[in-house]
């Protein structure tokens, strides 16, 4: 049986304990060094075949041990997965039915400006942040101590597998709340799904990925809306909370400020290359690991330094979002290319 799964635990001791218990049950498992592109706290992971995934789940239930991550081998790439989705992910290729990938499907800024120009604004004294500065989310004051953050983000898949796509899409949507200085409270699923092409099981795994990311963020699932469409689209409508006087905006940067990025650049380049079959396996795995990493911890650190301006870098890239920040702040941005953090490939 081909071993096509890597199961990550928090320590070498746990890996060895699970390996012994699994072998006692006749499972073909082995403790192996973690590949460079797979994040492991201890450097050792458990290798097993997807055919034994259910049996390994039973072993883990008995031991009361949960893996910190699971990766499935697809070609030469290790892609985020779960023991439950190990077989489903092999049956579909999400990007085959999509003309665009991820935020690359966004309409251009110029087109949006043309369409919105002349339309009336529905203003209110309690609307703290609206559409004027193209910020990451809207903010509405409820009381002197509490404001609600409203944002939505959905996109076509930029990876082939359902579970990691769900995780990535949810992380993108939640990031807008942290970019405004807030805390995610609740989210709703937004889905357009080609049922005949992909079948119901792939949808379940997309939603599973989104749900696990929501749980990691501390937000709850409050419902959703699904339609049957020609292409797969998935994302979230997210509600968050923030103090009205502590809202972060994409405007407010001052001359002399340093530009700090919470993640390395290059994920869009890697996923676009992967769609064309031109990306190396380790590069795809590294990119997916970063795309599923939440900006929550970075936001906690930013609170301590009281930033002048904050924005979420996604579909328009660093240059596009830096230009938005410069325009909203009334100043210029100077980028030193050699200083920009890029994926370690």
State the predicted function of each range.
Residues 1-88:
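Positively charged, small/polar-rich N-terminal and surface patches that mediate targeting and assembly
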Residues 86-345:
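Helix-biased detector of long, well-ordered alpha-helical tracts
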